[in-house]
Amino acid sequence: MSTPTSPTPKTAEVPARQPWPRGRRRTVALAVGTLVAASGLVSAAGYEAYHASTPSPAVTHHEKADGTTVIIPAASQNPIPLHGRIDTVDYQQEYQGVTYKKQALVYVPATYVQGVPANIAYLTHGWMSSAEEMADEVSPAIDDLERSGALSPTIVVFATYYPDRSFVNDDFETDYQLNRFFATSEINTLIDTIESRYSTYADGDTTDESLKASRTHRAFGGFSMGGITAWDVFALNPDYFYGYMPMAGESWIGRDHDAPLPQIADEVTLGVRSRGMGPQDFRIIASVGSDDPALDDMNPQLGEFYRRYPTLMTSQSLQVWIDEGGTHSLASVSRQ
């Protein structure tokens, strides 16, 4: 995963190995903030100043009398529950002729008011992981931003691409079929379920027209295989999202036919190009740890995106953040 450094990714003359910006910040929280800032709702500089001065908390869990669970920063002498809350939302998804009962975890900020639209971000995990694990790592960082007032009201949805846990196995490559399905089909089910329940800029209307009109207030991200999912969403389903956060994952578009880098760049950008979108119509924050093997997979693609489409993939529309010393782990995600 990565961290932002001022816009330094180059657009045209990109060396074989790009010297991406490096540092240590909490990627997911800051990325959500930056994507929100890109819509003019909050200052990105404010996010960076906040994160530079705020340590990443350890967390513990406490079950309340009513059976709900709160996540508590363990580092504090007087632990305080999340300022916001975590809801569990049930939905059903059909996959290969079978209907599965699924759950998503929804971080709802304390600043949320029913009837007042909030921004929304959808996040998914990596191989063998779960929505619960990602929520545990990321929610405290998001909550810190909400509590400080640095983040405009933003709902964060943690979802799994596994129909159920029987799909988890020791071959991560088999996940890609599920990643593709989630990016092109299940995400639509999830949006319909979540945004008909919570107040977002879709205003309860999950028709195609409404979701397109409210896309600047919606982002999608993921870690590892979830990052690969994020690239699929950008390539194949860009109508509903403005922001994308692929963390420690390159695009697998074209993998089934061993596409060379120029063709991968063509296929990844085809969705926005075919819709007449320009660099002002999306923001990608691609992040990875400096000690993560995924960096070597992402680096050639990112360089090719800048090279082949310099007026589309600019230093603003495609940002690359590197977490110095970061590995392929959720700990790196939360730290960045």
Language model features by range: what are they?
Residues 1-25:
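Terminal targeting segments of Actinobacterial cell-envelope proteins
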Residues 29-33, 38-336:
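Non-catalytic cap/lid and distal C-terminal segments of serine-dependent acyl enzymes
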